[in-house]
Curated annotation (Swiss-Prot):
It holds the Pfam family AraC_binding. This is HTH-type transcriptional activator RhaS. The keyword Repeat applies. GO terms for biological process: positive regulation of DNA-templated transcription; rhamnose metabolic process. InterPro entries: AraC-bd, AraC_XylS_family_regulators, Homeodomain-like_sf, HTH-like, HTH_AraC, HTH_AraC-typ_CS, RhaR_RhaS-like_N, RmlC-like_jellyroll. Keywords: Activator, Cytoplasm, DNA-binding, Repeat, Rhamnose metabolism, Transcription, Transcription regulation. It is found in: Cytoplasm.
Amino acid sequence: MTVLHSVDFFPSGKAPVAIEPRLPQAAFPEHHHDFHEIVIVEHGTGIHVFNGQPYTISGGTVCFVRDHDRHLYEHTDNLCLTNVLWRSPDAFQFLAGLDQLLPQEQDGYYPSHWRVNQSVLQQVRQLVGLMERTGDGMDAPAVANREILFMQLLVLLRRSSLMEGATNNDAKLNQLMAWLEDHFAEEVCWEAVAEQFSLSLRTLHRQLKQHTGLTPQRYLNRLRLIKARHLLRHSDHSVTEIAYRCGFGDSNHFSTLFRREFNWSPRDIRQGRDAIIQ
C-alpha cells in the first residue's frame, strides 16, 4: 500500500498545515499517510473507499481522514478536491482542544463524512484562500495567523455540517443523501422521501441532479451497485443474495445494471478479475 509522507507535502519541517488542491482528482489507489487530512469536495462525483467502506461523494462532501486511516478514490467524474493537511493535534503552537471540533469515534463508529451546503462551501473556499496567502513565515504572528484560520475552518465545518441540522433546501438534501446511505436497500418512494425531508419532488429532482449529475433513481441505483460491489469483494454471500440485500428484486436485472455501471459482471468482481487487470 502506498504511504504518503509529510515531508513531501508540508512547506517546512515545522509547518502544521498545508493546502493540496486536486483539480481534478483522478482515480487513486489505496493509501494512507503520516498526517491528518480534511478532504473538501468542490464539485464532481466519485467513490471514496474509506477503511474498506464505499461512500458516494459529490460537491459539499467533507471527509476527515486520520493518520491511520486508509482510503482510495475510484469511479471519478470531474472530481475536484481541496485537501487541507495537518500534522497532528500537538503540532500547533497556539491551538489546543481541537478534538472537540472534529468527528470522534464512538463504539467503533467513526462519522468520517459530513456534508455542507453550497453557501458554506463558498465560505470554506475563502478561508482556504486566506490560508494559502499567509505564506510560509515561521515567526510567531505568522504562525498564529495560520493556526487561527485553521481553527476558523474547523468551527465553520462543525457549525455547518449535517450534525448541526440546518433547515434550508441544501441542508435538507444533504440529510436526504445521508439517509439514502443507510436505507439504500429499502423500497424508496420518492414522493414519500421528498415529504419526509420537507422538499417538493421537483426540488428534490433538480437539486440531486445539480449535486451529483444523476436523477434520483440513477443515484440510488449507483449507490446500491457500489454497496453490492463491496459485498462481492468482501463477503461470501451469493450474487443473488447480494442483489436482494442491496435492494434489487431481480438478480438478472441486477447483473445487467452492474455490468453497465462497472464494465464487469458480478462474477468477474467475485473472482477478482478487475484487480488482476489493474
